[in-house]
Amino acid sequence: AASADEADVYGFLNQPPVEQVRRIYTIDEVKRSSRLRDSVRRLEIGDLTFDTGKATISRNQVGSLSSVADAMQKMLQRNPGEVFLIEGHTDAVGSDVSNLVLSDQRASTVARILSDFYDIPPENLVTQGYGERYLKVKTEAAEPLNRRVVVKRITPLISYASAK
């Protein structure tokens, strides 16, 4: 989503899952199952950067969420029941436990910005941190590309109407 505009992001998030949805799942089932999460498209917020050990972003990075927020607003106008999963990730520096907490905080930071700055209703956002479990770059080093947030539209997995 680094330089994608709202129409590109909308088109991407609005695509059906990459495999057929077999049944309706709970949000907790989606959060726990990488197979389920991998069945929907992932949108990395490429312009967001987190410092090592930090869950905050600088004020000038808030704008990097505008195309994602605009696409979400458009989808919510069409279907107020849309649900988006905000995933937080860390690099491999630090303990597993501290990275899980940090990744949760990163996901929550992005969800809060989407709600506070872009008026995305909090009830349409679900957050989950995965720590260092899903490294983008396989390294134990402090790799900035691993300190990221991913947005997924999980509505087709949790809603009968959208799974048809």
Where are these regions (language model features)?
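Periplasmic OmpA-like peptidoglycan-binding domain that tethers envelope proteins to the cell wall
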Residues: 59-62, 87-164
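Periplasmic peptidoglycan-binding/tethering modules of Gram-negative envelope proteins
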Residues: 1-83, 155-164
